[in-house]
């Protein structure tokens, strides 16, 4: 049984995808349901996902798929929810262990431990494992993976437990999501903003404050180029 707000949000998402092929943004969902904050939208989406009504897909920030509707709403649906093209913002993912022939188009990437999307944790660890990714995701440069710990980047579509694919680099453009090393001891995943003579590390969750540092305290370790989410 869904609450009234959960039901309203589910139908709003479903109708928007049917009309435009694109999932609504957090701002649009907040406005449609007249919620006070985006964190309220996140809680509703999490509840719908836990109940099996929607799922969040990898690679894109605005990537929601409606799996089913409440019986009262589904009875009026003709045709049924499409299972084919989900729109330009959705990439279907299949992260099961690939068959031998499928691995011909994959590349093994080192897993370097966990990265904080929240309060910074200890600096990046040594290689703990390797995992396959599509070769076209890592064309050029050196790449590595990190498991996300925390919820400070949820509005960028990055959730606790996701694996982020990072291209190693020492600089980034303002607005890029980066792995930043603070004072050579704390690693965190944040959006980089260059403000005058300072560097801002910006969360994608209103519950976290932007942190501002002089440039010599922050070293860019890499830039986000992909994301993998596994469904169990």
Swiss-Prot record:
User: What reactions does this protein catalyze?
Assistant: Hydrolysis of Ala-|-Gly bond in repressor LexA
Q: What is this protein called in UniProt?
A: LexA repressor
Give a yes or no for keyword Methyltransferase in this entry.
Answer: no
- Please report the organism this UniProt entry assigns to the protein: Maricaulis maris (strain MCS10)
Q: Name one GO molecular function term.
A: serine-type endopeptidase activity
InterPro entries hit by this protein: LexA (IPR006200), LexA-like (IPR039418), LexA/Signal_pep-like_sf (IPR036286), LexA_DNA-bd_dom (IPR006199), LexA_repressor (IPR050077), Peptidase_S24_LexA (IPR006197), Peptidase_S24_S26A/B/C (IPR015927), WH-like_DNA-bd_sf (IPR036388)
Active-site residues, record numbering mapped to chain? 152, 190
The answer to whether UniProt assigns keyword Zinc to this entry is no
Give the matching Pfam families: LexA_DNA_bind, Peptidase_S24
DNA-binding residues? 26-46
What does the similarity note say? Answer: Belongs to the peptidase S24 family.
Q: How does it assemble?
A: Homodimer.
Q: Where is this site: Cleavage?
A: 117-118
In terms of domain of life, where is this protein from?
Answer: Bacteria
Q: What role does this protein play? A: Represses a number of genes involved in the response to DNA damage (SOS response), including recA and lexA. In the presence of single-stranded DNA, RecA interacts with LexA causing an autocatalytic cleavage which disrupts the DNA-binding part of LexA, leading to derepression of the SOS regulon and eventually DNA repair.
Sorted UniProt keywords: Autocatalytic cleavage, DNA damage, DNA repair, DNA replication, DNA-binding, Hydrolase, Repressor, SOS response, Transcription, Transcription regulation
């Amino acid at each position: 049984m869904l609450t009234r707000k959960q039901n309203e949000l589910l139908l709003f998402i479903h109708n928007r995808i049917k009309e435009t092929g694109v999932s609504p943004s957090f701002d649009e969902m907040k406005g449609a349901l007249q919620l006070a904050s985006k964190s309220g939208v996140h809680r509703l989406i999490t509840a719908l996902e836990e109940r099996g009504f929607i799922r969040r897909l990898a690679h894109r920030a605005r990537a929601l798929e409606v799996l089913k509707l409440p019986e009262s709403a589904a009875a009026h649906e003709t045709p049924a929810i499409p299972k084919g093209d989900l729109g330009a913002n959705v990439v279907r993912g299949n992260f099961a262990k690939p068959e031998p022939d499928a691995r011909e188009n994959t590349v093994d990437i080192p897993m370097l431990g966990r990265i904080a999307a929240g309060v910074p944790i200890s600096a990046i660890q040594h290689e703990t494992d390797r995992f396959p990714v599509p070769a076209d995701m890592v064309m050029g440069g050196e790449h590595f993976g990190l498991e996300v710990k925390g919820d400070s980047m949820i509005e960028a579509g990055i959730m606790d437990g996701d694996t982020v694919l990072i291209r190693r680099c020492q600089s980034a453009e303002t607005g890029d999501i980066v792995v930043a090393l603070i004072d050579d001891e704390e690693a965190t995943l944040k959006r980089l903003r260059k403000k005058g003579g300072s560097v801002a590390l910006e969360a994608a969750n209103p519950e976290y404050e932007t942190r501002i540092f002089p440039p010599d305290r922050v070293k860019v370790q890499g830039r986000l180029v992909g994301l993998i989410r596994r469904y169990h």
